[in-house]
């Protein structure tokens, strides 16, 4: 099945992934590509529509991102957002001006609903603005289709060429008509069908993996988390016993997790599974290391080394499966965005790795991965398992990792997860865990002074891990968790709850 494709061209905006999610919510497949993508590559991909993202630059900046003018003559509908809107105008000989003050926040906008872009919408609504420059003169063949008090051209169109630009951000919730507008672009302008689904995605991946692998042997980096589990099942459905799953028990797992992983994949899925006990090896490499980036790199490299050693025992192995997903790629940096932190599935890979990668989920957000898992018949409990980073508890123990610190974190985390489950909050909270900051504090237990560790509890609500908010857990649940941890984990005398959203914080502490 040939899927309809929309290209999201990345100019470095903070909402790029959100644009992609909005497109996919309409059952339309999209890919994010850098603005440096050539016309030839775009033609080869044959998209049905193109969306330019926003970005931090001015079109007059010395190193401002550009596109070839020929792109606007391909006959492919284009929607420019914010910087993408200004770039379209600038490229087609319109004029972009820098005003005395910027326009930011919720803004009333006047819409021309005779335009296909604003079909069936109110004439006045609310949008979200975040710009300094604006279009002061539209290019030849264009007309203005939206205005605000501060922005004489809040949107423009060349309906004949199917070129559209909006100065506001339709992808964010604060633009009340944004989802409807994007839907109009996809279905009224691009004439798409919206027939992409998780079942069709799984079918396409299984077919592609069969063709790519042939009769070669494959190993899978299995952690037991949602991402690697779904990746393993997709590949197993494609090639069966040609796949061997290697589960590295690095001693950085949650309580009883190693045994649970082994049971699920051996008993329920009948997969070839090798469990490698490598705790001493990993802790030895991590000894004396406090920097979180170094910890991630060390763990990523050791993972690959273990796989290489196991592969040699198995014979001729050609491919390695990883559960990399879209947010992993974004957080590891692109041509137009800074690196937030290197991801264990991306930045930690050694350059001399001997395997070719299979990453069947690299185009999906977490909620889409779960949907694929359900399609594949993976048990609901496993599909909705808590997200868990590849480096495991090593990045939830701040500073140097030791067996003692791991044991403290593991027990506190188990109590937190148990009480969340008892309260019926498991599927209402995206992610929740305990971590061990490198902090000790004075306390009193009985009649004695204590000087013990602090445990930080982190719980967030999200749909894709790109943004998140701290979870409003009932006080009585937090109270019970706190009392249990300080009573059952003797090395702890203080519990704190993290009430920071993402951004500015990331979900994990390291």
Curated annotation (Swiss-Prot):
<dbReference type="GO" id="GO:0003921">
    <property type="term" value="F:GMP synthase activity"/>
</dbReference>
<feature type="active site" description="Nucleophile">
    <location>
        <position position="82"/>
    </location>
</feature>
<feature type="active site">
    <location>
        <position position="169"/>
    </location>
</feature>
<dbReference type="InterPro" id="IPR025777">
    <property type="entry name" value="GMPS_ATP_PPase_dom"/>
</dbReference>
<keyword id="KW-0067">ATP-binding</keyword>
<keyword id="KW-0332">GMP biosynthesis</keyword>
<feature type="domain" description="Glutamine amidotransferase type-1">
    <location>
        <begin position="5"/>
        <end position="195"/>
    </location>
</feature>
<keyword id="KW-0315">Glutamine amidotransferase</keyword>
<dbReference type="GO" id="GO:0005829">
    <property type="term" value="C:cytosol"/>
</dbReference>
<keyword id="KW-0436">Ligase</keyword>
<dbReference type="InterPro" id="IPR029062">
    <property type="entry name" value="Class_I_gatase-like"/>
</dbReference>
<dbReference type="InterPro" id="IPR014729">
    <property type="entry name" value="Rossmann-like_a/b/a_fold"/>
</dbReference>
<dbReference type="InterPro" id="IPR022955">
    <property type="entry name" value="GMP_synthase"/>
</dbReference>
<dbReference type="Pfam" id="PF00958">
    <property type="entry name" value="GMP_synt_C"/>
</dbReference>
<keyword id="KW-0547">Nucleotide-binding</keyword>
<feature type="binding site">
    <location>
        <begin position="223"/>
        <end position="229"/>
    </location>
    <ligand>
        <name>ATP</name>
    </ligand>
</feature>
<dbReference type="InterPro" id="IPR022310">
    <property type="entry name" value="NAD/GMP_synthase"/>
</dbReference>
<feature type="active site">
    <location>
        <position position="171"/>
    </location>
</feature>
<dbReference type="GO" id="GO:0005524">
    <property type="term" value="F:ATP binding"/>
</dbReference>
<comment type="subunit">
    <text>Homodimer.</text>
</comment>
<dbReference type="Pfam" id="PF00117">
    <property type="entry name" value="GATase"/>
</dbReference>
<dbReference type="InterPro" id="IPR001674">
    <property type="entry name" value="GMP_synth_C"/>
</dbReference>
<keyword id="KW-0658">Purine biosynthesis</keyword>
<comment type="pathway">
    <text>Purine metabolism; GMP biosynthesis; GMP from XMP (L-Gln route): step 1/1.</text>
</comment>
<comment type="function">
    <text>Catalyzes the synthesis of GMP from XMP.</text>
</comment>
<dbReference type="InterPro" id="IPR004739">
    <property type="entry name" value="GMP_synth_GATase"/>
</dbReference>
<dbReference type="InterPro" id="IPR017926">
    <property type="entry name" value="GATASE"/>
</dbReference>
<dbReference type="Pfam" id="PF02540">
    <property type="entry name" value="NAD_synthase"/>
</dbReference>
<feature type="domain" description="GMPS ATP-PPase">
    <location>
        <begin position="196"/>
        <end position="385"/>
    </location>
</feature>
<protein>
    <recommendedName>
        <fullName>GMP synthase [glutamine-hydrolyzing]</fullName>
        <ecNumber>6.3.5.2</ecNumber>
    </recommendedName>
</protein>
